[in-house]
Amino acid sequence: MTELHLWLRHEPRTTERRTPVVPSDARRLVENGVTLTVEESPQRIFPIEEYEAVGARVAPAGSWVSAPRNTVILGLKELPDEPKELTHRHIFFGHAYKGQPGASDLLRRFGAGGGALLDLEYLVDENGRRLAAFGFWAGYLGAALAVLQHRGRLVAPLTPTSKEELDKTLQPAAGDEEFSALVIGALGRSGRGARVAFSTAGIEPTCWDLPETQNLDRPALLTHDVLVNCVLATTPVPPFLREPDLDDPTRRLRTVSDVTCDVGSPLNVLPVYDRTTEWDDPVRQLSDRPPLDLIAIDNLPSLLPRESSTDFSAALLPQLLEFETGGAWGRCLDLFRTKSRELGIAVGEGELGHV
Ligand SMILES: NC(=O)c1ccc[n+]([C@@H]2O[C@H](COP(=O)([O-])OP(=O)(O)OC[C@H]3O[C@@H](n4cnc5c(N)ncnc54)[C@H](O)[C@@H]3O)[C@@H](O)[C@H]2O)c1
């Protein structure tokens, strides 16, 4: 019987309605002997009563700070700024290993408290393949928003919705002009999502992945009306779009949706803009000669909180059930220690179960 005590925390970011564990999977955890505490949260897409009904304990929002030390705290996005010393093991997306703003501060908080970050982005199998990710829904939404913008039907501000409602808006209407679309990174998780959304909208996109961009045919790229970029770049490659392409009078391309959102990174394949767009103002015009609109939203799956949480939770559940023995968590812990030490931060040597 596992002794794992898992604590599902409230997300401080007010627009974040997703959760890494949905009530039906909470039931499976409890049935398998996990002690599960779930914090109340005003915005989580699943009400607290659904967790309580499957045997979870309920705690106030933010009360993880005083949870017993051996509790594993589970969330998705950033922690609040306090406490300064983090004593627990935390599972979430830390964004702390690529020199991001605030990365070293976060690792120092773990170092100071003796806790550990088990970063969901690096929860991988022995071949380095991600075990739980939101990519499919990112691509689905990236393509859906591009379709709506291109058809003149994108309504701002964007608000979280359901797939059913979104799909209704994607149906082609009388008078809609046909257009061509290109998905790059089409074989990945988000690329697959983008293809499914296009299909719902009645569009058959051109699909490119690594082989098709090896000798990039930029003129061919520019003959598409809509581009959805879904690549996961790991080494620098020639950009898909450059500043001069914006002024190219022969360009057909009118709408770009950048799911990847590597803005500011040396790996950015779309270095033609300098900041992401937001739910309040999702589209920015990059050029008016001829027009080119950009959508670059870096929290797309949050727009479909129920569907994206349900898929993510289903992928995470088997890993949580193997928390004490699972090699994937051991790899997360090793990486946390390596990255902390690279910054000169002292970290403990405890086993996964007793950090
Ligand atoms: N905007 C958002 O809200 C959001 C959410 C989740 C993920 N993402 C980002 O989306 C990107 C893709 O994530 P994923 O989960 O789909 O990754 P993935 O690894 O499943 O797929 C990436 C695909 O890109 C392809 N690729 C890599 N380099 C390429 C190149 N130069 N040319 C053509 N194809 C190339 C790969 O072969 C692969 O098929 C990541 O950068 C991820 O951080 C964004």
Ranges and model annotations:
Residues 37-59:
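N-terminal beta-loop-helix "entrance" segment that forms/cooperates
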